[in-house]
Regions:
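Predominantly soluble domains enriched in secretory-pathway, periplasmic, or organellar proteins
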Residues: 1-193
Length: 193
């Protein structure tokens, strides 16, 4: 499994199978009986919950040169899903899912980014940037998106996979706060009380 969450007494696991699997496994926590498997898209990677809904992101293919990067909304009641957009990174805060879709040109290590959010309570997709990116970040290779659960601050990591990366911090309203150096290829921020 690539990602796992708990929702309403069940574990939901996305199975990528090294790019060849397409299943969402559902396990009852009380019995831990054999998993129910639902076919979704190929090569899922992340799963999260917002507003009692499940959001799944992944590669959508095992063809490295042709990933469609779907982000889908999964309905646990009907066991169906619908695509809400493309995304490489997603995070949730206050029942809003924030998504970054990036296209990278590895010849010159530059990227272009599309940002949007999805309100799980109203089922509204907002197709505008949720942070005010500094100029350097607009073309950097983004490697992570995390949100501080206490105050809603966004943390976006960027790097080139060979030198130390940078973390860009934004207020909940998207205002840029600071940039600081971190290790190579930042993947997540962990928040400790």
């Amino acid at each position: 499994p690539e990602g796992i969450i708990e929702e309403d007494g069940k574990l939901y696991l996305v199975n990528s199978g090294f790019g060849y699997d397409n299943r969402l496994s559902i396990i009852d926590i009380n019995t831990f009986d054999k998993a129910e498997n639902i076919e979704i898209f190929q090569n899922p990677e992340k799963i999260l919950e917002a507003g009692d809904k499940l959001f799944i992101q992944g590669y959508g293919s095992n063809d490295y040169n042709n990933y469609p990067y779907p982000v889908v909304l999964f309905d646990p009641t009907t066991k169906t899903y619908k695509e809400i957009g493309k995304g490489v990174y997603m995070a949730e805060h206050d029942d809003i899912v924030y998504v970054i879709y990036s296209e990278t040109n590895y010849a010159d290590n530059t990227s272009t980014h599309t940002l949007y959010s999805y309100n799980a309570k109203t089922n509204e997709k907002v197709e505008k940037a949720f942070v005010q990116m500094p100029e350097k970040l607009k073309t950097s290779i983004i490697t992570m998106l995390s949100i501080n659960p206490e105050n809603g601050d966004f943390y976006i990591g960027a790097g080139d996979y060979t030198t130390n990366g940078d973390i860009y911090r934004f207020k909940k309203d998207g205002t840029f706060i600071e940039k600081f150096e971190c290790g190579i290829d930042p993947k997540a921020a962990v928040f400790i009380d």
